[in-house]
Design a protein with these regions (language model features):
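Bacterial N-terminal signal peptides that target proteins for export
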Residues: 1-3
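Hydrophobic h-region of N-terminal signal peptides that target proteins for export
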Residues: 5-15
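Central antiparallel beta-sheet cores of small beta-barrel/beta-sandwich binding domains
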Residues: 34-116, 120-126
Length: 158
């Protein structure tokens, strides 16, 4: 094998290996989510979420979000999550009326839950090549119709 062929093989192998998303490792410590919230029939508003996550006293993962949504008063919400199988996490969120379900697949995760008023939320997170940023896309539906959408990024700060 020539040197050039070896380099091309190595480059192809490295490109084929996607980074794996470890939700607990990513969200342990401080993260900041910067997004735009688009609700049907309303103007888009900035949605900024500052989060602190870590191990809870019962061995679970706990994350506290400070949510800045447009001109609304700042609010907090709390996630409590536990692994329930390989690449599968389940728990609670103060905004949710159903359990929160997280399925991780390679470099991405899908989070689903139901909010007050019957809004069904589906969130997709995709790890970016830098390993410290996630793309964040959320759709909230009611009666099968898209009611709201969030698009932005999550950055690991420490």
């Amino acid at each position: 094998m020539t040197f050039t062929a070896a380099l091309l093989t190595l480059a192809a192998s490295a490109a084929a290996e996607k980074p794996r998303l470890d939700m607990v490792a990513f969200f342990t410590g401080h993260t900041r989510t910067e997004s735009v919230l688009k609700v049907a029939l309303h103007k888009p508003v900035p949605l900024i979420v500052d989060s602190v996550g870590g191990k809870g006293d019962k061995g679970d993962f706990v994350m506290i979000d400070t949510v800045h949504e447009g001109n609304k008063p700042v609010r907090t919400r709390k996630w409590i999550m536990r692994p329930v199988g390989p690449n599968h996490i389940r728990g609670t969120l103060t905004d949710a009326t159903s359990p929160v379900d997280v399925v991780v697949s390679g470099d991405s995760a899908t989070i689903t839950y139901v909010m007050q008023g019957g809004l069904k939320v589906e969130q997709h997170l995709q790890l970016q090549p830098d390993g410290r940023t996630l793309s964040n896309h959320v759709v909230a539906k009611k009666f099968g119709l898209k009611f709201a959408r969030v698009d932005g990024t999550v950055r690991k700060l420490d």
